[in-house]
Design a protein with these regions (language model features):
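Short, solvent-exposed loop/turn elements at domain surfaces
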Residues: 24-29, 44-49, 78, 151, ...
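Alpha-helical, coiled-coil/dimerization segments enriched in small aliphatic residues
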Residues: 42-47, 54-55, 158-183
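A short, structured surface patch at a secondary-structure boundary
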Residues: 15-86, 176
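Short secondary-structure boundary segments
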Residues: 20, 40, 80-81, 180, ...
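A ligand-binding cleft/hinge motif common to bilobed small-molecule-binding domains
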Residues: 82-93, 198-213
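Proline-aspartate-enriched helix->loop->beta-strand connector
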Residues: 57-60, 64-78, 96, 184-201
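Extracytoplasmic substrate-binding proteins
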Residues: 15, 75, 85-156, 177-179, ...
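Short, structured coil segments at secondary-structure junctions
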Residues: 32, 54, 93-96, 171, ...
């Protein structure tokens, strides 16, 4: 068997644990179900992940390698160096491979992470449908989007060059620059955007952030309001692709 084919076969037999909500997303979308041995507890929460039904089929962990050792993983995935040197050292002693994905800062970074995870689990072909959909969105994106503001609890918003704003541009929306990364009630009252994108992340909770979004000025701002599923915006990974496709279909 050629060396590359042997490597793919070994990867396809991997037992994979994810210690992070964002790597949970990549793993659930790109691995075979039987390869997954543990996911972070957050992915099992309906308020945190659109994939919670799938995630509940697997044991949860609290984000440490010690939590998953009893599952005998051969590969442990984290993001942004979560767990640090201690995780890498322990994994090395136990002959467990680790894959630490970088936090993507642009759409190319998301595509790269998709490819890396698919290759790591021995199924590079699983990346292709997601990459094809992403490229289709990029090819068909308009040059100048509609003036828009993305908003979540407490008036938090996105920087105009952030990864979140790049996803918005694929939906034909141009994030307005705002001082301090905040939307004020005064802005919504005096210079509202053409479209207000409201995150529904934990919107049903009795929290200060949720109450801010229910303020009369926010609710009655003279602008078209679109509700977005706030959960994919936490990680800004491949689950943003179906959400952007959905936002495109909404009437403006």
């Amino acid at each position: 068997m050629p060396a590359f084919a042997s490597l793919l076969a070994a990867s396809a037999a991997a037992r994979v644990a994810s210690l992070n909500l964002c790597t949970d997303e990549y793993l659930l979308l790109l691995a075979q179900p039987e390869q997954i041995v543990s996911l972070s507890y957050l992915s099992r929460d309906p308020l945190e992940s659109p994939l919670w039904r799938q995630a509940r089929h697997y044991p949860g962990n609290r984000g440490s390698i010690e939590d998953v050792l009893a599952r005998h993983p051969t590969l442990v995935m984290t993001m942004g160096g979560v767990g640090g040197r201690s995780t890498a050292l322990l994994a090395g002693r136990l002959h467990i491979q680790t894959l630490s994905l970088p936090y993507a800062t642009d759409l190319d970074g998301v595509a790269s992470n998709i490819q890396r995870v698919a290759a790591a689990v021995g199924h590079p072909e699983h990346a292709m449908p997601w990459l094809s959909r992403l490229r289709a969105l990029q090819r068909s994106a308009v040059a100048h989007g509609v003036d828009a503001i993305w908003i979540s609890g407490h008036g938090d918003t996105l920087a105009p060059e952030s990864l979140g704003a790049q996803w918005m541009r694929l939906a034909g929306l141009r994030q307005r620059p705002l001082a301090g990364g905040k939307v004020t009630l005064e802005t919504l009252l005096t210079t509202p955007p053409k479209i207000l994108i409201k995150s529904d992340y934990r919107s049903g909770q009795m929290s200060g952030g949720a109450r801010w979004l229910r303020h009369p000025i926010v609710r009655s701002a003279g602008t078209r309001q679109l509700i977005t599923d706030g959960r994919p915006w936490t990680c800004l990974g491949p689950l943003m692709i179906p959400e952007i496709e959905r936002l495109r279909r909404l009437p403006r």
